[in-house]
């Protein structure tokens, strides 16, 4: 599914790919929700793909691009940071579902958090240093609050 969405301050060309089986498909958010979450965190214009994957693909990508041999919740790939940002977010549905259950969070809220988190990474935010982490977490919390979701760090 691909669609252009425009807000007063941002234009988003979004493709959502679902490389997952029926069980994970049932647990994954709709394209409309993904678009809503991405736009809420976007400052400027972007062309991006959100790819929802299973554990095997998530593990392979994390190993190949980060040198870590396990599936992680979200991976961010930035391709262009000019006037129109271009990049991909890859979310591993079984990992996101497992984390939500382990942390006692609603699955939808956890997906929203990870899309917002990934969108901030696409725009250059990071959390390696403590001051960067604080800034990024504050932004995530603010964006999620505007969407009606609780603070993911509380």
Swiss-Prot record:
GO terms for biological process: rRNA processing. Binds 1 zinc ion. PROSITE patterns: UPF0054. GO terms for cellular component: cytoplasm. This is Endoribonuclease YbeY. Signal peptide: none annotated. Pfam families: YbeY. Keywords: Cytoplasm, Endonuclease, Hydrolase, Metal-binding, Nuclease, Ribosome biogenesis, rRNA processing, Zinc. InterPro entries: MetalPrtase_cat_dom_sf_prd, YbeY, YbeY_CS. Its main location: cytoplasm. Its EC number is 3.1.-.-. Zn(2+) binds at residues 117, 121, 127. Belongs to the endoribonuclease YbeY family. Single strand-specific metallo-endoribonuclease involved in late-stage 70S ribosome quality control and in maturation of the 3' terminus of the 16S rRNA. It is found in: Cytoplasm. GO terms for molecular function: metalloendopeptidase activity; RNA endonuclease activity; zinc ion binding. Its cofactor is Zn(2+). It is an enzyme of class 3 (hydrolase).
């Amino acid at each position: 599914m691909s669609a252009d969405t425009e807000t007063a301050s941002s234009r988003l060309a979004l493709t959502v790919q679902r490389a997952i089986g029926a069980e994970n498909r049932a647990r994954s958010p709709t394209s409309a929700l993904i678009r809503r979450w991405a736009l809420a965190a976007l400052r400027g214009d972007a062309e991006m793909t959100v790819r929802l994957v299973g554990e095997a693909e998530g593990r392979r990508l994390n190993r190949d691009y980060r040198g870590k041999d396990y599936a992680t919740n979200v991976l961010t790939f930035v391709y262009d940071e000019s006037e129109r940002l271009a990049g991909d977010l890859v979310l591993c549905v079984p990992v996101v579902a497992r984390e939500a259950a382990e942390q006692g969070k609603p699955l939808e809220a956890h997906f929203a958090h990870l899309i917002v988190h990934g969108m901030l990474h696409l725009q250059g935010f990071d959390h390696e240093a403590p001051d960067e982490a604080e800034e990024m977490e504050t932004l995530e919390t603010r964006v999620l609050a505007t969407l009606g979701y609780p603070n993911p760090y509380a």
